[in-house]
Amino acid sequence: MTILIDADGCPVVDLTLQIAKRFVAPVIILCDTAHQIEREGAQTLVFDKGADSVDFALVNRVKPGDVVVTQDYGLASMCLAKCARVLNQNGLEYTADNIDALMLRRYENKKLLRAGKHPKGSPKRTKEQDVRFTDTLEKILNCNH
């Protein structure tokens, strides 16, 4: 079981590495040339900047039982299809039960953007989000050990 991080814009890279170290779980950080992220204790793979280049590289590497950290619903859906466990930076685990609704929300938001309506941005990251992320990742890793 490997933890793969879609690291472009991911606020929990270091937190993931701390947790992975306790579980002796290997970590692969995937990013594009605009976000080169090197961390001790992880393998970093860097890809050309471009639409979905990191996403497709991650999907090509993920295996059943792996854990993926991403905030991208489309990538999450593809990883679920490959029998990976997937969570976002706030500790929400994507599942077959919630991914369709999340994909629909993404579609609706894109329609609003095309119509010139911009949804509010994300609020500042909180300690509670880190706690939820930690709890969810530890729960997943405990199931896989």
Residue ranges, per PLM feature:
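Nuclease catalytic cores that cleave nucleic-acid phosphodiester bonds
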Residues: 2-145
